[in-house]
UniProtKB/Swiss-Prot annotation:
This is S-adenosylmethionine:tRNA ribosyltransferase-isomerase. The gene is queA. The keyword Ubl conjugation does not apply. Its main location: cytoplasm. Pathway: tRNA modification; tRNA-queuosine biosynthesis. It is found in: Cytoplasm.
Length: 361
């Protein structure tokens, strides 16, 4: 499909720079393409009204790490140059793939010392070698540290990698360390939050428990590739960046039991959905799964296991707007976003939420 079919105009004032307080007071646009009135306006706190006892919410429990690194590039015969790197996928205990700027001036073999003046980890400076250089500013960094020592060093000198549409308007601050993390995050490795989960509070969890709605957790480490624009003119020519994760055998069995009892699988966030669909057989059975997924969902995709999706409002021409268009219908989602813009919904990572029912085949 032509990528420009997924374009729309979004006024700057619709981009949220801070989350709603409290989190579950954010607005919730319910989108049911199978209903006569497909759109209705609510609050996230109303979520239990649209779920049934025996349904299962699937959360992504990845935890955002301070993956934005600032440093100085060193090269024989050349002076130091300031560079930045956003880590997006770990490939070994001492290696990370990253998006580096300025990408054109970084070469294989360069040494980079990360951390501003006065910043250091408990073992000193955080240094790496550019082991490989790929396309679009992507590099493979081989750090001098490894394993837990590297983790602690990154935590000491790194910064929360705010999405570019927020970072362009304000700097990261201490509030973001809490705001840009779900209350159930536990598996470190993401460089972007699974933002649909940001709306959940302990009180909302209690309400879900009282309603008999199950909660299950999977892990997909969201990479910085989620923010990359689609530069191709046709979706067939776009290549997704890989993201690593897993679905345990225990969780797969529990979700299959939910489906067998007639319950619905409700994914909280596109990352949970992409992981479950990667793990599902054509029959809909969810299998234990571990690895890297580059699943790219566009209209025409046949969903195998997911019945409902809670997600924030996404960028024009993005792979995520393509995904929701595949899930609830292309025309329905364009109408929903038009309604959201005209009625003041807040967009993107810190914005409001939508609850989508899967379009009947």
């Amino acid at each position: 499909m032509r990528v420009d079919l997924f374009d729309f105009d979004l006024p700057d004032e619709r981009i949220a720079l801070r989350p709603a307080e409290p989190r579950d007071s954010a607005r919730l646009l319910v989108i049911d393409p199978n209903a006569e009135n497909s759109l209705s306006d609510h609050r996230v706190g109303d979520l239990t009204s649209f779920l049934r006892a025996g349904d299962a919410l699937v959360f992504n429990d990845t935890k955002v790490i301070p993956a934005q690194l600032e440093g100085i590039r060193h090269r024989d015969g050349a002076g130091g140059q300031q560079v930045s790197a956003t880590l997006h996928m770990r490939t070994s205990p001492s290696r990370w793939k990253a998006f580096a700027k300025p990408g054109k001036r970084i070469k294989q073999g360069d040494r980079i010392s990360f951390g501003h003046s006065g910043e250091s980890c408990f073992l000193g400076s955080l240094d790496a070698t550019v082991e490989e250089k790929g396309e679009a500013g992507e590099v493979t960094l081989l750090f001098d540290l490894s394993g837990p020592a590297l983790d602690e060093a990154i935590a000491a000198v790194g910064h929360i990698p705010l999405p570019p549409y927020i970072a362009a308007k304000r700097p990261e601050d201490e509030r973001d360390r809490a705001d840009y993390q779900t209350i159930y995050a536990r598996e470190e490795g993401a460089v972007a939050a699974p933002t649909a989960g940001l709306h959940f509070t302990p009180g909302l969890f209690e309400a879900l428990d009282r309603a008999g709605i199950e909660r299950h957790f999977v892990t997909l480490h969201v990479g910085a590739g989620t923010f990359l624009p689609v530069k191709a003119d046709d979706t067939a020519d776009h290549k997704m960046h890989l993201e690593s994760g897993y679905v345990s055998a225990e969780i797969a069995a529990r979700l299959n039991a939910v489906r067998e009892r007639g319950g619905r699988i409700v994914c909280v966030g596109t990352t949970s959905l992409r992981l479950i669909e990667s793990a599902a057989e054509e029959s809909g059975e969810i299998m234990p799964w571990a690895g890297a997924t580059g699943i790219f969902i566009t209209p025409g995709y046949r969903f195998k296991a997911v019945d409902m999706l809670m997600t924030n409002f996404h960028l024009p021409r993005s792979t995520l707007f393509m995904l929701v268009s595949a899930f609830a219908g292309f025309e329905t989602m364009h109408a929903a976003y038009k309604h959201a813009i005209s009625t003041g919904y807040r967009f993107y990572s810190y914005g409001d939420a939508s609850l989508l029912f899967r379009k009947d085949r």
